[in-house]
A protein has these predicted regions:
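C-terminal interaction modules
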Residues: 1-24, 46-49, 73, 81, ...
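Structural recognition of beta-strand segments within beta-rich domains
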Residues: 29-179
């Protein structure tokens, strides 16, 4: 029997498993509420269902009349309203149930953010106009073209523009409004919010509930061969 006949399949299998290794991704949370069209955006757009993993460095988008809630590994709850886009820029684990560093970019749409068990300094939330630092916080965040609104529901937060103009939110209802007009960015503070996430909560059952993360410790999603077999199994 020609030795090459036996060696080639083995070498090919090794190469196929090694090549996608970079594609293996870390599970950092899971979807607990999915209403209508919710997708992850990468090289291809794929739908997300309840129970699906939330992966490090991924972008999530909701469609019109759609909503979603994700629970991260540290029990942070992220709720998205219709036509929202969220990017997990960075997640660095401290241990299996907390983060040392997590950066979340809320590009467009309406969101509710409830902190989990990580140190509050670990969280960095950004919109195109603002950077938000949290301290034991429930926040409603609206990101629109030329305008961001940050409403404190509980805890405290610091909201800064990209030019380091900052306001401190310390009382429920405290609101930072950041606007960009003609290239000039300004920030104001009020205790009369022009908007909150409450209407989204009322429209979608479970969207604004708060759950602890029930999954196992963060796991690596193995690369899968074309025949559906897991490499290394």
């Amino acid at each position: 029997m020609n030795l090459r006949f036996w060696l080639f399949p083995a070498l090919l299998s090794t190469a196929l498993c090694a090549a996608p290794a970079a594609l293996a991704q870390t599970r950092v949370g899971e979807a607990v509420v999915i209403q209508n069209e919710v997708v992850r955006v990468a090289a291809a757009t794929t739908p997300i269902s309840v129970g699906d993993s939330m992966l490090r460095d991924e972008t999530v988008r909701t469609g019109a009349d759609s909503a979603a809630r994700f629970v991260m590994a540290d029990s942070t709850n992220l709720s998205l309203g219709p036509s929202a886009t969220l990017k997990l820029d960075r997640t660095v684990f401290n241990d299996e149930h907390s983060y040392r560093d997590v950066a979340i970019r809320m590009t467009t749409g309406a969101f509710r953010f409830v902190t989990g068990h990580s140190e509050k300094t670990a969280y960095k939330i950004t919109t195109p106009l603002a950077t938000i630092g949290v301290r034991g916080t429930t926040l409603d965040i609206l990101s629109q073209r030329g305008r961001s609104v940050v409403v404190l529901q509980d805890g405290a937060a610091s909201v800064c523009t990209t030019s380091s103009q900052c306001v401190q939110l310390t009382q429920p209802g405290d609101t930072a409004i950041i606007t960009s007009t003609g290239g000039k960015v300004s920030i104001t503070k009020t205790n009369t919010p022009p908007w909150t996430f409450a209407a989204n909560c009322a429209a979608s059952a479970g969207l604004c509930a708060v759950n602890q993360y029930a999954g196992a410790s963060p796991t690596i999603t193995p690369a899968v061969q074309d025949d559906g077999m897991l490499c290394g199994r």
